[in-house]
From Swiss-Prot:
Reaction(s) catalysed (UniProt annotation): uridine(38/39/40) in tRNA = pseudouridine(38/39/40) in tRNA
InterPro entries assigned: PsdUridine_synth_cat_dom_sf, PsdUridine_synth_TruA, PsdUridine_synth_TruA_a/b_dom, PsdUridine_synth_TruA_C, TruA/RsuA/RluB/E/F_N
Subunit architecture: Homodimer.
Protein name: tRNA pseudouridine synthase A
Higher taxonomy: Bacteria, Pseudomonadati, Thermodesulfobacteriota, Desulfovibrionia, Desulfovibrionales
Length: 277
């Protein structure tokens, strides 16, 4: 048998996450793992199991998910990238397929991961091309969010940022980066002679006058708990909206209780950006 590693990109909007779901009471929902295994099994003529580096949730995207699979030696030299992409739906794409040592494991060999969460600083209007990939939050206090983010750096017990439904051994993780950056160009508001914003639209007009751009938050760690990034993002947005002071973060970490932290951020703003080996 030969072990192959895949780099996979996908738009999670219409996918039920990475992992095949164990259910027999209803039709299996569409998953990334399921779509890839469907094609691999058709080529090999026998069941093929893929192992992903991260189990992204329903609605979460990926730019560079990594997975591995074992195939018969006589199938190892096929043009697997072309074969996958010829049969995959348009929301999943294989960027690369390479042969790796037999002992390589996409999940257990990973030293860390980087996720990006995108925010759109306006709630009344979102460009259609951004709507599936960014949380429209409205204007936020970025300085307060920066101050709160600083408390998340380093080794901590992140039990307050873990959702239920996992059997992990420890909730201690080391976060090496929580930082924001702007992406893309600001949409241009046409300068219309004598134009005045209508009632209720002043916030949008003022925001566009200042230049609207996507705010991307990068989270890097040696590993993440279930929905940990979305829960940290939910905290930072709550701080940005003035619902919590930045210095509330240490107490939330110390509590080790999910109920002490704000609500989970929506799935659609999150993208798995990179797996580190």
């Amino acid at each position: 048998m030969a072990r192959l590693a895949l780099t996979v990109s996908y738009v999670g909007t219409r996918l039920a996450g990475w992992q095949i779901q164990a259910r027999t009471d209803r039709p299996q929902p569409r998953t990334v793992q399921g779509e890839l295994e469907r094609i691999a099994e058709r080529i090999v003529g026998a069941p093929v199991r893929l192992h992903g580096a991260g189990r992204t949730d329903s609605g979460v995207h990926a730019e560079a998910q990594v997975a591995h699979m074992d195939v018969p030696d006589h199938r190892a030299d096929l043009d697997w990238q072309r074969a996958f992409n010829a049969g995959l739906p348009d929301d999943i794409s294989v960027a690369a397929v390479v042969r790796v040592p037999d002992e390589f494991h996409a999940r257990f060999d990973a030293r860390g991961k980087t996720y990006t969460y995108r925010l759109w600083p306006e709630r009344r209007w979102v460009p259609p091309r951004l709507a599936p990939f960014a949380w429209a939050t409205g204007q936020l206090d970025m300085d307060a969010m920066d101050a709160a983010a600083a408390y998340l750096h380093g080794m901590h017990d992140f039990a307050s940022f873990q959702n239920t439904g996992t059997d992990i051994v420890t909730t201690v993780r080391t976060v090496t980066r929580v930082a924001r950056r702007h992406e893309g160009e600001a949409p241009v508001q046409p300068a219309l002679p004598g134009a005045q914003p209508l009632a209720g639209a002043e916030e949008t007009a003022n925001a566009m006058a200042g230049g609207l751009r996507v705010m991307a938050w990068d989270f890097e760690a040696d590993g993440f708990l279930k929905q940990m990034v979305r829960n940290m993002m939910g905290l930072l947005v709550a701080v940005g909206r003035g619902k919590l002071p930045p210095d509330a973060v240490p107490a939330i970490l110390a509590a080790r209780d999910r109920k002490t932290a704000p609500a989970t951020a929506p799935a659609h703003g999150l993208t798995l950006t990179r797996v580190h080996y």
